[in-house]
Amino acid sequence: MLRGDSAAKIQERYAELQKRKSHPTSCISTAFTNVAALCRKRYQMMHPELGLAHSCNEAFLPLMAFCGRHRDYNSPEESQRELLFHERLKSALDELTFRPCSEEQRASYQKLDALTELYRDPQFQQINNFMTDFKKWLDGGFSTAVEGDAKAIRLEPFQKNLLIHVIFFIAVTKIPVLANRVLQYLIHAFQIDFLSQTSIDIFKQKATVFLVPRRHGKTWFIIPIISFLLKHMIGISIGYVAHQKHVSQFVLKEVEFRCRHTFARDYVVENKDNVISIDHRGAKSTALFASCYNTNSIRGQNFHLLLVDEAHFIKKEAFNTILGFLAQNTTKIIFISSTNTTSDATCFLTRLNNAPFDMLNVVSYVCEEHLHSFTEKGDATACPCYRLHKPTFISLNSQVRKTANMFMPGAFMDEIIGGTNKISQNTVLITDQSREEFDILRYSTLNTNAYDYFGKTLYVYLDPAFTTNRKASGTGVAAVGAYRHQFLIYGLEHFFLRDLSESSEVAIAECAAHMIISVLSLHPYLDELRIAVEGNTNQAAAVRIACLIRQSVQSSTLIRVLFYHTPDQNHIEQPFYLMGRDKALAVEQFISRFNSGYIKASQELVSYTIKLSHDPIEYLLEQIQNLHRVTLAEGTTARYSAKRQNRISDDLIIAVIMATYLCDDIHAIRFRVS
């Protein structure tokens, strides 16, 4: 619209004004045509169509003619002019008839309106805006906020879990009527395939605990959560408590820096007395930062979210103040901490592992199932199952483990690996569900319709004890067979010698033979007998017991009898079994099978020494319940034991474990005719 000379001069003048610091950066509006607003008033004109413009535009005749031709003078004649319709259009419009809305359609519209009600709720809009901005931050959308934010971020599972805890609790407290609808939205937003009711109840809890190894971004992740909550949640009150003042001050400055550089243009950000507040015109969102040495600052507050960083190292006096917020129904307390398992004072939150409701989330490089085997291998740095994720910025190798333990013995397991050491040491090996299933579900082995599915071989393990001390040890005998992929217990005996005057070998052999003959007579489909007599205590006595059992059994039945043979010191195969390092392997295999439901008992179980006073299965379950693992020191082989103080011995459970262990085909070659 301007001539070449005028346009050049205006552009030059505009460039000069842009360089001045006193002049605002945005001097040309995109909403209004004020391109000549900076020229002198003598050269300005006000035009109906052009607005404030340079007076030179009046000399541009085509522009003036165009404006005059299409000018709206707001004349009454134009507004009152009668509109003319074509006759065919008028007749077609007259023939149109409208049907009344059906009840089904009206109901569907009401349902649709109810479904979309959530998305029109102002509280939901705040949650949705928070999720949108957080997703933008993860994708690197805030490149101007903080150095490094331009890179895409991938959250660890515990960080995503922490974020869900925060958002879901806020959604439940702010929109209680639409809580279930918000849940569906969160499942979609976080791309969760399935969420059980138990998990939903966990998210609704007023307190949750995260135990995470060091250097995993616990404090780093809290900063954006607080920042975006302040921006989008109107009227929210957040509390942050750290174990040291310099940590709380660091988080305070980082949150303030992020708020001022991200959205200070839209909101007023204020930092006063360790409180960051954002004015939303209608209400203020605040975040208070304190240390455990000044817990009086959090008294009297009305927090919606209270974050306790490094909770294991918070002073116990301050913990009482923090736990007082549990009485407020709109407060969520999140404890986040690393652990040092050398001291109970720095891992006391692990006691929550036995809580009736799940509130403890433990992150470790090693799962609880393989923690002990990991401890035994001095150079291991990864879990054998490789199920756990290790971030790329974490470097763990055998040299790191050796170096840490050189500075302080056990430092690698106590300080670096994670917070499961104290939990796993007291973990029961046999689950309650498997014990109840073993006690209730017993197969009937006399059912003729099931004969074809039962194994034809009976395995018997005998652990002799040559003492009369009932508290020390007794003779354990177990008879086990197969049923498809499961193992059936046919007979159990726990025999104690009356006195040392009688022949111990004869008494033990008679007890075992009596049970074996009874089992064989009840189950005619058994056509082979495999016996293993333990010879660790006395090999000569074990050989004699084997011979006596063979004579007693073969005198009553024509079944084929095989014994487990082991070379003696003269390299002669003898009918006894020497238990060695394979005991630990047998116990671990039994635990796996028992917890998986592969160990079952027969309804017609034979027992002459137990059945008089106890149910043999309940008697066996008492010993199974006592089964525990004993680790002497790091790098040493662990042992298993079922002995507890003032409780019965573990002879019977050892016999059952070894009988099921020897059922494997890999041991078949060791069974021979004696």
Curated annotation (Swiss-Prot):
Q: Which UniProt keywords apply?
A: DNA-binding, Host nucleus, Hydrolase, Viral genome packaging, Viral release from host cell
Q: According to its UniProt record, which residues of this chain constitute the active site?
A: E310 (for atpase activity), D463 (for nuclease activity), E534 (for nuclease activity), D651 (for nuclease activity)
Listed EC numbers: 3.1.-.-
Q: Which cysteine pairs are covalently linked by disulfides here?
A: none
One GO term under biological process is: chromosome organization
Task: Supply the enzyme class, top level.
Answer: hydrolase
DNA-binding found in the keyword field: yes
Localization recorded for this chain is: Host nucleus
Q: What does this protein do?
A: Component of the molecular motor that translocates viral genomic DNA in empty capsid during DNA packaging. Forms a tripartite terminase complex together with TRM1 and TRM2 in the host cytoplasm. Once the complex reaches the host nucleus, it interacts with the capsid portal vertex. This portal forms a ring in which genomic DNA is translocated into the capsid. TRM3 carries an RNase H-like nuclease activity that plays an important role for the cleavage of concatemeric viral DNA into unit length genomes.
Q: What is this protein called?
A: Tripartite terminase subunit 3
